A protein has these predicted regions:
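Alpha-helix-loop-beta-strand connector modules within alpha/beta enzyme cores
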Residues: 53-72, 98-115, 144-170
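Active-site mouth loops of central-metabolism enzymes
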Residues: 7-25, 107-114, 165, 169
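N-terminal active-site wall of soluble small-molecule enzyme domains
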Residues: 39-102
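Catalytic domains of carbohydrate-active enzymes, especially glycoside hydrolases
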Residues: 28-43, 125
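Structural preference for beta-strand elements that scaffold enzyme active sites
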Residues: 10-12, 37-41, 67-71, 85-88, ...
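Glycine/Thr-rich beta-alpha phosphate-binding loop at enzyme active sites
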Residues: 81-93, 110-157
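Glycine-rich phosphate-binding active-site loops on the catalytic face of alpha/beta enzymes
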Residues: 13, 89-99, 131-143, 168-192
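Catalytic cores of alpha/beta
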Residues: 31, 70-85, 114-126, 158-165, ...
Length: 192
């Protein structure tokens, strides 16, 4: 889709669950300067909205400097308020059609867990990317849904919509996902 351009920047970086100090912004600037990151997702589940907006404004500047798409997790309202590049929606978050009315032509990505049916629904509703996972064990999040390369390959057969692979991705396993045509690799715990 037009909102996501193909390039060799395959990392979809996700924030730590808490941003405790100003050192984070310095680290983020360094990581984004590697020119391997396409997306940065702000994922602060337990933070107040006002703090998310405050933190989001700082991160947006860093993302813009490095030409990295800035994505907000779960919340189309904050996405719009920050004028972020897009929003990532889980299955229990706002419906994509409702989110699209708020966000217009911004990027909307959808969690599909390990389900081709959820992927088909997201494709029908014109999601900009599909996220599948967890592919591997992760220290960032308790694993509820486990997926595999078979699901990834099935998804690639039914759509050209970009696919983000999630869950426990690190140096020892990332190549297998890229070789099986995942477009982006979501990384959090391995970096932070």
């Amino acid at each position: 889709l037009k909102r996501i351009k193909k390039n060799n920047k395959f990392i979809y970086l996700i924030s730590p669950s808490k941003i405790k100090s100003n050192n984070f912004y310095i680290e983020l600037d360094k990581v984004l300067s590697s020119k391997k990151v396409s997306f940065f997702q702000l994922r602060l589940k337990k933070e107040k909205k006002t703090n998310k907006i405050f933190i989001g404004k700082k991160i947006k500047k860093i993302c813009k400097k490095h030409k990295v798409k800035f994505i907000i997790n779960d919340d189309p309202i904050i996405t719009k308020k920050l004028n972020a590049d897009g929003c990532h929606l889980g299955q229990k978050d706002m419906n994509i059609l409702k989110a699209r009315k708020i966000l217009k032509n911004k990027i909307i990505g959808i969690t599909c867990h390990n389900s081709i049916n959820l992927a088909k629904k997201a494709i029908k509703n014109k999601a900009d990317y599909l996220a599948f996972g967890a592919f591997y064990s992760s220290k960032t999040k308790k694993i509820k849904y486990r997926t595999n390369l078979k699901i990834l390959n099935l998804a690639k057969k039914i759509t050209n919509t970009p696919i983000v692979a999630i869950g426990g991705i690190k140096l020892s396993n990332y190549k297998k996902l890229l070789l099986n045509k995942a477009n982006f690799l979501a990384i959090s715990g391995y970096i932070w």
